[in-house]
Amino acid sequence: MTTAARPTFEPARGGRGKGEGDLSQLSKQYSSRDLPSHTKIKYRQATQDAPEEVRSRDFRRELEERERVVARDKNRDRPTREHTSSVSKKPRLDQIPAANLDADDPLTDEDGDEDSDEDSDDDTAALLAELEKIKKERAEEKDRKELEQKAEEERIRMENILSGNPLLNLTGPAAQSQASFKVKRRWDDDVVFKNCAKGVDEMKKQKRFVNDTLRSEFHKKFMEKYIK
């Protein structure tokens, strides 16, 4: 049996290689598995939430500081937006000369916004009414289907009851009625060992023995039952 597949747990000993005449000297060839590994201990770093760091931190103060920074950034962006919106509105107001202003002029942007808001409210109300109508129709359709299903199940149940009772199933054809009234054979009519004691008295009365297989009573009964 070969030993080539067995692992080597120690380096080979020298003495047989080229220039290795001293048998007591170990070989310089060694396996990487024999080298020491994990020679340094890994310490917990400063950002790995050591128990001492967690106990010394003030989480509430850090949370408040982060909230203040976020609020400061929001307040810093808000004036810029207001300034840009006011600058964009000024040219449109300046473009309208004062002499052309009249009471019969079309509605301003604010009035148009109000009208659009009213239109959107009307559209929303119409959509909600349509949605409610659709929901009501679906509920009615579901109730109707459930009633139809219950009626069909009741009809099938009554049909099964009437067809299962031969005394009530007189409305069908004559052949079906005759078949339903026919007496069924028992499951053990043609079994092998049925009525084993039948005919014992007759056999006792005869008390005869024939040393012939073809003229024996068993052979006669067998031929009469299966051949004739």
Swiss-Prot record:
GO CC terms, sorted: catalytic step 2 spliceosome; nucleus; U2-type catalytic step 2 spliceosome
Single Gene Ontology MF annotation: RNA binding
Compositionally biased spans, kind Basic and acidic residues: 52-84
Matches recorded under InterPro entries: Cwf_Cwc_15 (IPR006973)
Coiled-coil region list: 121-165
Biased composition (Polar residues): 24-34
Protein keywords: Coiled coil, mRNA processing, mRNA splicing, Nucleus, Spliceosome
Region (Disordered): 1-126
Superkingdom of the organism of origin: Eukaryota
Localization terms from the record: Nucleus
Main subcellular location of this protein, as a coarse class: nucleus
Similarity comment text for this entry: Belongs to the CWC15 family.
Function: Involved in pre-mRNA splicing as component of the spliceosome.
Protein name as catalogued: Protein CWC15 homolog A
Name of the gene encoding the protein in the UniProt record: cwc15-a
